[in-house]
From Swiss-Prot:
Annotated protein name in UniProt: Hemoglobin subunit alpha-A
Source species taxonomy: Eukaryota, Metazoa, Chordata, Craniata, Vertebrata
Name of encoding gene: HBAA
Molecular functions per Gene Ontology: haptoglobin binding; heme binding; iron ion binding; organic acid binding; oxygen binding; oxygen carrier activity; peroxidase activity
Positions contributing to heme b binding: H88
Species of provenance: Anseranas semipalmata
Function noted in UniProt: Involved in oxygen transport from the lung to the various peripheral tissues.
Amino acid sequence: MVLSAADKGNVKTVFGKIGGHAEEYGAETLQRMFQTFPQTKTYFPHFDLQPGSAQIKAHGKKVAAALVEAANHIDDIAGALSKLSDLHAQKLRVDPVNFKFLGHCFLVVLAIHHPSLLTPEVHASMDKFLCAVATVLTAKYR
């Protein structure tokens, strides 16, 4: 999916606004995904999946860092997330649909915390961006 200049601007604006909350939102996104799509828990059998657990927060921080990295390198998401793509495809073997679930949950978290920011145009841009991230993360599954 090709991101237009307007899409790229919208994505950068969103990440600029969420700034210091990215880690918090990453953990909240994971927690929401585990609750809404319980099958995703199978990849975390060693985690304490209770809300607010240190493991959820730590992994949420990694999720947030990857999304920020992708946003910071929006013209080369594949390059920015290449190692992460390798990890998920070759070692972790995460079901590709989980990346779509994660993107959906991230949009919900954004909508909860920043309802006025998520206009229809920004929502569409973020959805395209998150789909692009999911596509990159699943590209090496073939």
